[in-house]
């Protein structure tokens, strides 16, 4: 009962906040508001320097692999089983999935910096 009440309250609060943001008036963005500000001086270099998409893809790949390894480390405690073959097989399955996804990224040149 408490979980359902908390879930319903959080859902209603999130919906209320979303509705309020859509009802609020959109502020006009003047040219002065969109320009970068450097202590009262004109900016020396452009404020929005584009970065390489390869860097973004490598960062996302790192986050995914880091998350999967974070799931792999507590696996023996999470399963809490006396069935050792089941734990070993599930760990090996996760490692095989990690290896196959790394090989796929490598073959698709997702980790290649030169182009």
Curated annotation (Swiss-Prot):
EC top class named in words: translocase
Membrane protein topology class: Multi-pass membrane protein
Gene3D superfamilies reported in the protein's UniProt record: NADH:ubiquinone/plastoquinone oxidoreductase, chain 3
The keyword Transport is annotated on this UniProt entry: yes
Recorded family membership: Belongs to the complex I subunit 3 family.
Protein task: Core subunit of the mitochondrial membrane respiratory chain NADH dehydrogenase (Complex I) which catalyzes electron transfer from NADH through the respiratory chain, using ubiquinone as an electron acceptor. Essential for the catalytic activity of complex I.
The protein's name in its UniProt record: NADH-ubiquinone oxidoreductase chain 3
Originating organism: Gorilla gorilla gorilla (Western lowland gorilla)
Taxon lineage: Eukaryota, Metazoa, Chordata, Craniata, Vertebrata
Gene: MT-ND3
């Amino acid at each position: 009962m408490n979980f359902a009440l908390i879930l319903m309250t959080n859902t209603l609060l999130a919906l209320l906040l979303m509705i309020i943001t859509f009802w609020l008036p959109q502020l006009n963005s003047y040219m002065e508001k969109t320009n970068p500000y450097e202590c009262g001086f004109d900016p020396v270099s452009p404020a929005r320097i584009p970065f390489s998409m390869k860097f973004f893809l490598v960062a996302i790949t790192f986050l995914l692999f880091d998350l999967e390894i974070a799931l792999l480390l507590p696996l023996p405690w999470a399963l809490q089983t006396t069935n050792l073959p089941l734990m070993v097989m599930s760990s090996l399955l996760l490692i095989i999935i990690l290896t196959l996804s790394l090989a796929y990224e490598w073959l698709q040149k997702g980790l290649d910096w030169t182009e």
